[in-house]
Amino acid sequence: MKEERISNYVKLCEEWAQRFLKMDQADLHKRVPELKEENGFLTIIHFGRRYGVSLEDGSIRSLDGQREPDTTEMLNIYTLLGYAKEGAFIMDKWVPFADLRNARPFAPAYQIGETDVFSATFSGHEKELREAFQKLDGRELPQGDVGYEIRAFDCMPMRFFFWERDEEFEAQGNILFDYSATDFNLSLIHI
């Protein structure tokens, strides 16, 4: 008989589901006020999609009729619920990843794995990038050839700026976070 292997990410989500069930719900609502209780779930919007965390078993499900969440989406939600600090608030002070509290050691990896990929992926595809941000209910910004603010969560806005390549420069992208982002989630490298 062949043994079925379970991904470590799936195992981690299962652990987080159990951890969620032990969380003080009143405290959780104070730390993440955007949570709403509905039909046995705490609901939350993540990148424009509606999810529910089951109050019965701690699992996360799609509530918008689209595909079920993948492990990255689930871990983003679980870490927000687990690490958001009470009293955290949006400061409206925009900084690159490297300037977030305690993020500097991870900045080179973030640059290579996120910002550089963002720039390369959308080079020559400004129209598609605009359409993607619009699908995420993004708010257009005046900076860059394409600039939008979107929300990873209501409490965690992000700003994306893109400059198309030209005869002198390669395409450039930048992703800015509100300085308070690490008060809401310690694992921003995955968002």
What positions do the PLM features span?
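Amphipathic, interaction-prone secondary-structure segments
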Residues: 28-55, 140-164
